[in-house]
């Protein structure tokens, strides 16, 4: 059974990767889908985010990266995927995610959402926290892979 793990991944963190690795043990294939949310302003470009996700899936045999600029349900339907994986850090995540899951289900009746609780050591972690810490020169190596840390340093130094 295939699953989609969608997100902005701006940038991908060890919290995202924890959910990905655990999902890859449950499902036959996991597509990590880099998406655009019209309500978000991104730090990294779409292609930069996809490139980082491609590196993140390299060591996971049954995971692959992809990107899409439309509705998740449209991608899922076209790809024949009926499972969406989402990570939850706190009850506030659940409140938003349950709404999205219901909307997705209304648009694609066969689509189910599976929630995985994040590892407690990542329960505070978000891409925005990583970006903020990196913007002040903080050490983000506990939260992101080395290639993401380097990309953050390049962006904040102005040498993209």
UniProtKB/Swiss-Prot annotation:
Residues annotated as site: Transition state stabilizer: 16
GO molecular function: ATP binding; pantetheine-phosphate adenylyltransferase activity
Intracellular or extracellular location(s): Cytoplasm
Keywords: ATP-binding, Coenzyme A biosynthesis, Cytoplasm, Magnesium, Nucleotide-binding, Nucleotidyltransferase, Transferase
EC number: 2.7.7.3
Catalytic activity: (R)-4'-phosphopantetheine + ATP + H(+) = 3'-dephospho-CoA + diphosphate
Amino acids binding substrate: 8, 40, 72, 86
Any GO BP: coenzyme A biosynthetic process
Cofactor(s) required, per the database record: Mg(2+)
Binding site for ATP: 8-9, 16, 87-89, 97, 122-128
Recorded metabolic or biological pathway in which this protein acts: Cofactor biosynthesis; coenzyme A biosynthesis; CoA from (R)-pantothenate: step 4/5
PANTHER family membership: PHOSPHOPANTETHEINE ADENYLYLTRANSFERASE
General function of this protein: Reversibly transfers an adenylyl group from ATP to 4'-phosphopantetheine, yielding dephospho-CoA (dPCoA) and pyrophosphate.
Family annotation (HAMAP family): PPAT_bact
Family note: Belongs to the bacterial CoaD family.
Subunit structure of this chain's protein: Homohexamer.
Protein name stated in the entry: Phosphopantetheine adenylyltransferase
Organism: Kosmotoga olearia (strain ATCC BAA-1733 / DSM 21960 / TBF 19.5.1)
Gene field: coaD
């Amino acid at each position: 059974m295939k699953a989609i793990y969608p997100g902005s991944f701006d940038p991908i963190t060890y919290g995202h990767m924890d959910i990905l690795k655990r999902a890859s043990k449950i499902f036959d294939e996991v597509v990590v889908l880099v998406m655009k949310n019209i309500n978000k302003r991104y730090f990294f470009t779409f292609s930069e985010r996809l490139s980082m996700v491609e590196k993140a899936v390299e060591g996971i045999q049954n995971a692959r990266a992809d990107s899409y600029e439309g509705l998740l349900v449209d991608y899922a339907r076209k790809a024949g995927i009926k499972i969406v994986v989402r990570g939850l850090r706190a009850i506030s995540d659940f409140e938003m995610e349950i709404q999205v899951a219901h909307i997705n289900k209304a648009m694609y009746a066969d689509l189910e959402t599976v929630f995985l609780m994040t590892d407690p050591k990542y329960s505070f972690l978000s891409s925005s926290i990583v970006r903020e810490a990196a913007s002040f020169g903080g050490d983000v190596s506990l939260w992101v892979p080395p290639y993401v840390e380097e990309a953050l340093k390049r962006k904040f130094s102005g040498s993209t």
